[in-house]
Each structure stands twice: as structure tokens, then as C-alpha cells.
């Protein structure tokens, strides 16, 4: 009887772990958002109505804003392909033409409708205010021609 009880407990444990693993995998698959470049999207690597992230560079001269609204349009490129993006929310402060961007959304009729925009920058980014503070002003000396005299109290 004791061996039968252990076998039953082991089977229940295996069933519980299997169920938990299946539910976890299903939840993760539903929440995964893949990153694609414009050339991959136009090649058809994504399904038409699925959510995904679009990464690339905002093409210079492509940014347009509808006056009086938050609606914007711009083109994201990876150097090989171009894809039009529409966005209807406030853009991040770092958003600029010629800079990297990651947009989350879905394709609709050949246009990427973004729900979220992340402006990316490289590791050498320095805020403008910090750059201005780091530049020497006319009253600052960039080097000393003479040694500093020591003062004694």
C-alpha cells in the first residue's frame, strides 16, 4: 500500500509540474514581442495582424506631423528597405531623424501602426546641458602656464 501511495503521489507531482510548465509557456508565447527590421517585415517574415517590434533608423527628411494633433508619420529604414510608421502619441524626447528607434505595434495595409516608441541612442550619448557645461567658458583656463603658488597660513 505504501508503494502504491508513493507512485500515486509521484504521478500527481509530474502532472502538476507538466500543467504548470504548459501554462507558463503559453503565457510567455502570448506576451512575446519579436524585433524585426524593415527588410524582414517587407519580405513577409511577420504575420499581418500580430504585434511585433520594428527597429531601424528614422530616415532624415521623412518626419511629418499633422498640425493641431499628436499624429506623426515617418519612415524607418535599415539601409535595405523603408517602412512607413504612424504614431498618435507624444514622442520621446530623444526621438530625432537619423537616430535609432524601436516601435511596438502592428502592420495595417502596408503601414506600421505604432503603439509605443522607444528612441535609442548609443553609449556615447551626452545630454546637451552637460555638453554645454563641459565646454570651457572665456573665464575658465584650459591649462595652467605657471605652477600654483602654495600659501601658508
Curated annotation (Swiss-Prot):
Periplasmic side: 28-153
GO molecular-function term, one example from the UniProt record: heme binding
InterPro entries for the chain: CcmE, CcmE-like_sf, NA-bd_OB-fold
Location within or outside the cell: Cell inner membrane
Annotated heme binding sites: 121, 125
Residues in compartment: Cytoplasmic: 1-6
SUPFAM superfamilies recorded: Heme chaperone CcmE
Keywords: Cell inner membrane, Cell membrane, Cytochrome c-type biogenesis, Heme, Iron, Membrane, Metal-binding, Signal-anchor, Transmembrane, Transmembrane helix
GO CC annotation: plasma membrane
GO terms of biological process kind: cytochrome complex assembly
Residue spans of biased composition, Polar residues class: 130-141
Region annotated Disordered, chain positions: 130-153
Transmembrane segments: 7-27
Signal peptide boundaries: none
Keyword Iron recorded: yes
Stated role: Heme chaperone required for the biogenesis of c-type cytochromes. Transiently binds heme delivered by CcmC and transfers the heme to apo-cytochromes in a process facilitated by CcmF and CcmH.
Stated family: Belongs to the CcmE/CycJ family.
Protein name: Cytochrome c-type biogenesis protein CcmE
Species of the source: Xylella fastidiosa (strain 9a5c)
Gene that produces this protein: ccmE
Amino acid at each position: 500500500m505504501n508503494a502504491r501511495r508513493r507512485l500515486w503521489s509521484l504521478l500527481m507531482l509530474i502532472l502538476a509540474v507538466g500543467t504548470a510548465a504548459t501554462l507558463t509557456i503559453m503565457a510567455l508565447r502570448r506576451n512575446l514581442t519579436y524585433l524585426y527590421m524593415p527588410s524582414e517585415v517587407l519580405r513577409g517574415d511577420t504575420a499581418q495582424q500580430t504585434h511585433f517590434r520594428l527597429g531601424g533608423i528614422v530616415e532624415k527628411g521623412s518626419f511629418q506631423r499633422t498640425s493641431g494633433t499628436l499624429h506623426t508619420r515617418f519612415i524607418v529604414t535599415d539601409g535595405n528597405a523603408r517602412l512607413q510608421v504612424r504614431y498618435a502619441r507624444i514622442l520621446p524626447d530623444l526621438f530625432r531623424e537619423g537616430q535609432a528607434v524601436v516601435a511596438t505595434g502592428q502592420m495595417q495595409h502596408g503601414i506600421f501602426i505604432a503603439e509605443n516608441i522607444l528612441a535609442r541612442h548609443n553609449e556615447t550619448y551626452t545630454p546637451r546641458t552637460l555638453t554645454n557645461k563641459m565646454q570651457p567658458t572665456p573665464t575658465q583656463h584650459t591649462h595652467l602656464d605657471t605652477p600654483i603658488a602654495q600659501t601658508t597660513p
